[in-house]
Amino acid sequence: EELVEEALKKIFSDQQYAIHDPEKTESWIKFTLGMIQKALKTKGRSRSIDEIKQAIEVMNKCNIALYKNKKEIWSGAILQDLVTVGREEYLASTDTHHIARLPLFISHSINNLDYRQFNYDRLMSCDEQLTRWLYKRLINRFTQASHITEYSCMYSDIKQASGLLQQNKEGNNRSKILSAFNELKEKGVILSCKINERKIGRAITDIKYTIKATPQFIKEQIASNKRTTDIRT
């Protein structure tokens, strides 16, 4: 579902398929299954039409919630108010246009011009889902990336926030994070990652990861900051 979601947001960025109402804070996207399939195939992430159908079903029917300070601030589906040609033909044709409303927080970001631009090609080239999750986190959190700044995060936070560390053994979960960070090194995002284990006795209770960015990622973050500033002024 996550890759299909990214493809849809990329399609939305093409104004030909985007409808945004700033007064109502609503954003709608027009798409076909064929458009999604082509967008994924172009980035080496080919999916069958049936897989795309299932992903859209999940994004439309599953409810997610956002919390701030342990208080729910938003609840809804990733694809809301899905409009199709009829239940019999529901997502049956690769050439049939469908329309869906994007979540409120996306519309709010567009209205306030506080969304982050990033390297979409690099995101889609990452093989591991956790790698893509960490990459998007760095894009949004490591906004002041420079040659002298570092970004730190905790294992416990990654596990809770990502929902992608479901192994029974914590050692396997930790290995999965290291694999994701290594892929980010290969993709030219992070230069180094220092590991500081927190222990009680011999037991590891948490891990602190301290990251330095590559010159390329620093350059991209600076450019993204400038574009955001230019748009707002």
Question: What function would you assign to each model-found segment?
Answer:
Residues 1-233:
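Charged, alpha-helix-forming regions
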